[in-house]
Regions:
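Conserved class I S-adenosyl-L-methionine
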Residues: 2-47, 60, 64, 81-84, 142-172, ...
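Short alpha-helix
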Residues: 182-205
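A short acidic, Gly/Pro-enriched loop at the edge of an enzyme's catalytic core
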Residues: 104-113
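Core SAM-dependent methyltransferase catalytic element
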Residues: 200, 217-237
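A short glycine-rich, Lys/Arg-flanked "PGG" loop and its adjoining helix->strand segment in the class I
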Residues: 127-142
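Class I SAM-dependent methyltransferase SAM/SAH-binding core
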Residues: 52-54, 58-102
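A short SAM/SAH-binding and catalytic strip from SAM-dependent methyltransferases
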Residues: 112-126
Length: 237
């Protein structure tokens, strides 16, 4: 665990395990049965709307929104993830390699909805990222965000300073392969302040239950309700 004064942030190198991660993500409790259903619910009716998926990974949320009638675009920092997404959505899809922390390759005011599911917690400084996401949104457009719930860090790292912006890493396993992901924790007050400082209006914050159709064998002992991710719907004035 490291504070901001000693570590320069770096993106997780998904290229090393893109296929393994995609396979694990497609049917996992936290992604397939928790995060994606809530992201789709908060995005609302996307038929005929232009939707950007920021940090799209291998594209499952893009596929779901396209199937609901959206005109989708997406970007991710990992070329390997983008290759998988392009295979799923077709070679003519607007899927690009781009960095959430850098200026984005899109014009101003072009998207009705922007989704950013489980990507911002890889970013140390949210200000430039949120400024860019707001820039590409049309006035009145909706930004839907999912992050690791800050309270998860408080529960799992009780000896650490909850109120400090902190870099930490965790190992995951799938089919015998181990991969490491590195995150930036920030307290809830800093999450909310970042959105407000970006000029966004918070219209909803949710801690949902898992999808009612979740296979029972995937659920934890506490059932459908547990603390995992925190979701926001925001509006660009």
């Amino acid at each position: 665990m490291t504070g901001t004064d000693t570590i320069t942030p770096e993106a997780p190198d998904y290229d090393d395990f893109a296929a393994t991660y995609a396979a694990a993500n497609d049917d996992s409790l936290f992604n397939a049965w928790y995060a994606r259903p809530e992201m789709l619910r908060l995005a609302g009716d996307v038929r005929g709307k232009r939707v950007l998926d920021a940090g799209c990974g291998h594209g499952p949320l893009m596929v779901a929104m396209r199937d609901r009638g959206a005109v989708v675009a997406g970007f991710d920092l990992s070329p390997a993830m983008i290759d998988i997404a392009a295979d799923r959505l077709g070679s003519d899809s607007d899927i690009r390699v781009a960095d959430l922390s850098a200026p984005l390759p899109y014009d101003d005011d072009v998207f009705d909805v922007v989704t950013c599911s489980l990507a911002l917690h890889y970013v140390q400084d949210w200000a430039p990222a949120l400024a860019e996401l707001r820039r590409v949104l049309k006035p009145g457009g909706r930004l839907v965000v999912a992050i690791i719930h800050p309270f998860v860090y408080a529960f799992c790292y009780q000896d650490e300073d909850y109120f400090a912006l902190t870099r930490y890493s965790e190992d995951y396993e799938h089919d015998g392969a181990t991969f490491t992901l590195t995150y930036w924790h920030r307290p809830l007050q800093d999450v909310i302040s970042a959105f407000l400082d970006a000029g966004l209006v918070i219209t909803s914050a949710t801690e949902p239950e898992a999808d009612p159709d979740t296979p029972p064998e995937l659920l934890p002992p506490e059932g459908h309700r547990f603390i995992c991710f925190l979701f926001f719907a925001l509006e660009s004035p």
